[in-house]
Amino acid sequence: MKPSIITKLKVLQERYYEVETLLGNSEVAKDRERLRILSKEYAQLTDIHTCFQHWQQVQENISITGPMLEDPEMHDMVQDELNKLHSLLSTLEQQLLTLLLQKDSNKDPNDERGCFIEVRAGTGGDEAALFAGDLFRMYSRYAEIHSWQIDVISASSGPHGGYKEIIVKMSHDNAYGQLKFESGGHRVQRIPETESQGRIHTSSCTVAVIPDILHAELPEISPEDIRVDTFRSSGAGGQHVNTTESAIRITHLPTGLVVECQDERSQHKNKAKAMAVLSARLRAAEAQCRQQEESCMRRNLLGSGYRSDRIRTYNFPQGRITDHRIGFTTYRLNEVIEGKLEILLQPIIQEYQTNQLIALSESEIT
């Protein structure tokens, strides 16, 4: 294991003892928020501390056992013992690298947030809108299966079903971390119901997954930088629909970003939702710029997450889904569309974590 990683582990070990002492402090016990934060950190550090202690003990055993190889009568037995110790040491090193990745300082801070999901129909006309509806159902069912709260922020229906565009909010602490790799272009291949010759048509949708940032962390938007338009809602809502201009359209003038919300009957609530989406988009755009400047690792492995990147193809006649970023194919399309999204999520997350482990083991840790 690299000296830089050992140094990092020793620093975390010292922090473990420090936090342990703090948790025994009566003043800390009176501060519930600080106690909660320290308890969470202690739980993370405990696993690292325990594993690192085990690694140190095995390393010491290797140092003690090694010189015994010089005894001809014990050589074979000692060599066998050393082989076992080195194998155990290698296993512990992999566990330590994984634990380091799970440490907050090495994770995307947005992973534990909720998220907004934007699905837009692309090329393919009515079929693209229908496919956008399929994707929305897929994400909705996944959220329901895992007891996440899902709220529709804005929806523009297609003329024959589905959606031209739909924006939803997933309220769960780990929603963004689970779904962030869904960003990009999704392509569908299937035979439309109106196709009399049985020909397969290709359509596409784009998906953007944006972290739901806490209000205090959102970028400040100057009133001079936005234009707010009101219009009558065109969605569901009974007699109230089209009687008042409760729907909101906000345009961010410096960037040209446009957000609409007509889900609520209250103009005030629609504006609040639209501003939340706009702020999250601006924050995501800033983060994307930083990622471009600082690192290309994620882009090289998993695509940039830009809407122009084709990340996945859904072939309905064959029941096949292919994730082009990692060359993963499954023939469980119907299950995925009905919400078993982990079939696709687990391989992509595992591939990403493997790449992080490689980068962590090859680079200096500060």
From Swiss-Prot:
InterPro entries on file: PCRF, Pep_chain_release_fac_I, Pep_chain_release_fac_I_sf, Prokaryotic/Mito_RF, RF-1
Compartment annotation: Cytoplasm
Sequence positions bearing N5-methylglutamine: Q239
Keywords: Cytoplasm, Methylation, Protein biosynthesis
PROSITE patterns: RF_PROK_I (PS00745)
Record's keyword annotation contains Transferase: no
Entry's Gene Ontology cellular component terms: cytoplasm
Name by which UniProt lists this protein: Peptide chain release factor 1
